[in-house]
Amino acid sequence: MSDLNQGPGASTAQPKPIEAKPLRHPGRWVAAAIIVALLAWFIISALNNEAYGWDTYRSYLFDTRIATAALHTIALTLLSMILGVVLGAILAVMRMSGNPVMQGVAWLYLWIFRGTPIYVQLVFWGLLGSLYQSINLGFAEIDLQSLLSNMFLLAVIGLGLNEAAYMAEIVRSGIQAVPEGQMEASKALGMNWSMTMRRTILPQAMRIIIPPTGNELISMLKTTSLVVAIPYSLELYGRSMDIAYSLFEPVPMLLVAASWYLVITSILMVGQYYLEKHFEKGSTRTLTARQLAALADAEGAIPGNVTVVPETSKEN
């Protein structure tokens, strides 16, 4: 094998590699020490402050009512996200379709639900029972009282419909990030539209869709605290405040709710990390030596940090 970097001056001795010393950053250590000192001061001050009500905090941290409320919060989060993801995917397809009517309907939906505050929407869903008691179809009348009196269901619908407007843009951006040639190649192989989306487009788009969707899931967990506007108060924040009002101690119960939110959010973040790793299989942002050699051959120049050695054929 021969080195392609050989030239007229190949016989000259190669220079010794530079022994670079890492740059020192004393300012970082000073800043870290200041932050640690301030954090330690705040923690010690808070632990010695009776206004935080640490006895109440310890008494209610694992209370059965709080644990049940945490389960209600998780159920609200998952059901609302499922509704939001499914409806958001449908809206994304409608926006990318060639039908102007479907595009207009999807745009109007996004305009309304992204343009109004989620709290206002939830208040509206809570008042829906006073606006519509029944629906008269002429030949039949549908009673809505039993449906609209289910506050948990209204909370899921309100959160899910709002989330769908944001998921539609996330899904649309992920699909549009896949090169158009992928769709054309799939059609050339005889795949129909649904098979192309399932086997070609979505697996590549998921690498772009998953990170913002994970952020939306975490955001949805915290947004469930707003369903008291419906009103639905059996979730974590509402239940904590009910206990706080009976004890006249809002601070420790707020800390209890915050602790549960932090634990659940941390679990979701770990799940998001491994899910992103799963969909990143087969993709990399670095080039292998063979790819660098091919790039050098295409450009007619060899990168300075790469030595290209031609492959020898294997003997039979």
Curated annotation (Swiss-Prot):
Q: Which Pfam families match?
A: BPD_transp_1
The record lists the membrane-crossing segments as 29-49, 74-94, 108-128, 151-171, 217-237, 251-271
Quaternary state and partners of this protein? The complex is probably composed of two ATP-binding proteins (ArgV), two transmembrane proteins (ArgU) and a solute-binding protein (ArgT).
**Does Membrane show up as a keyword for this record?**
yes
InterPro entries for this protein:
AA_ABC_transptr_permease_3TM, ArtM/GltK/GlnP/TcyL/YhdX-like, MetI-like, MetI-like_sf
> Where this protein primarily resides, as one coarse class?
membrane
Q: What is this protein called?
A: Arginine transport system permease protein ArgU
Annotated Polar residues bias: 1-14
Record's subcellular location: Cell membrane
For molecular function, the Gene Ontology terms on record are:
transmembrane transporter activity
Q: What does the record say about the knockout?
A: Deletion of argTUV in an L-arginine producer strain results in a faster and 24% higher L-arginine production in comparison to the parental strain.
Give the PROSITE patterns listed for this entry: ABC_TM1
Q: Which PANTHER family match?
A: L-CYSTINE TRANSPORT SYSTEM PERMEASE PROTEIN TCYL, MEMBRANE COMPONENT OF AMINO ACID ABC TRANSPORTER
Its source organism is Corynebacterium glutamicum (strain ATCC 13032 / DSM 20300 / JCM 1318 / BCRC 11384 / CCUG 27702 / LMG 3730 / NBRC 12168 / NCIMB 10025 / NRRL B-2784 / 534)
Region Disordered: which residues? 1-20
Job of this protein:
Part of the ABC transporter complex ArgTUV involved in L-arginine import. May also transport L-citrulline. Probably responsible for the translocation of the substrate across the membrane.
